[in-house]
Regions:
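…; additionally, a secondary subgroup of soluble metalloenzymes is captured
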Residues: 1-105, 112-196
Length: 196
């Protein structure tokens, strides 16, 4: 995939499309390799050198992609124009389904779920009979720290999410409501998603 990277590096959109289309498979392969290596390889054995070489190749590619991403991010800003931002995800995709009479909605709020892991989870959900499970890439709120990322998935985040600096830390708030804990975030969901 490294040799194809230059073909998809001209813009942020091209790089994102490359990741969504095929580059994510490299992350999946690395995750699966590490799981297998942990189970099978003798750290001092004959395969240790090959495992180290595979890890170095993955790291080189990841570093190249990250460098390109950061350069494009500095030029283009974030979130990418014309793409779904996490902060708009609830209001655009979840809320309309919640308003449908009789519609059951499962909302999974999972911290640090990489795209390639969602694809694997999606495959399992569909295989388990949940044919309505959907894949809709959405782009994280920066900075990608847990409190900010999880707050960005709440109802109204696209319009009301703010980042406050408190005690030398970034603290998310929806309007005036500071959100520093799971309990506070769940209270927002309960208040805004309660059936009439």
């Amino acid at each position: 995939r490294s040799r194809h990277l230059s073909e998809h590096s001209r813009s942020l959109d091209a790089l994102l499309d490359f990741y969504l289309g095929s580059l994510h498979a490299v992350d999946r392969a690395q995750r699966e390799f590490e799981a297998a290596a942990g189970d099978l390889l003798d750290p001092a054995g004959e395969l240790a050198a090959a495992a180290s070489q595979a890890r170095r190749a993955y790291r080189r590619l990841a570093d190249q992609v990250q460098g390109l991403f950061l350069r494009h991010l500095a030029r283009s800003g974030w979130p990418p124009a014309g793409r779904l931002a996490n902060a708009d995800l609830f209001d655009r995709l979840v809320a309309p389904r919640l308003s449908e009479s009789g519609r059951r909605v499962a909302l999974l709020l999972i911290d640090a779920l990489r795209y390639e892991l969602w694809l694997a989870l999606h495959t399992h959900l569909v295989g388990a009979g949940h044919a309505g499970a959907e894949i809709q890439p959405a782009f994280a709120q920066l900075p990608t720290i847990t409190p900010v990322g999880m707050a960005s998935l709440l109802p109204g985040a696209g319009q009301a999410l703010r980042l406050l600096r408190r005690n030398d830390q970034m603290t998310p708030a929806l309007g005036e409501q500071v959100l520093t804990s799971v309990t506070q975030r769940m209270a927002v969901l309960r208040a805004r998603c309660r059936p009439p």
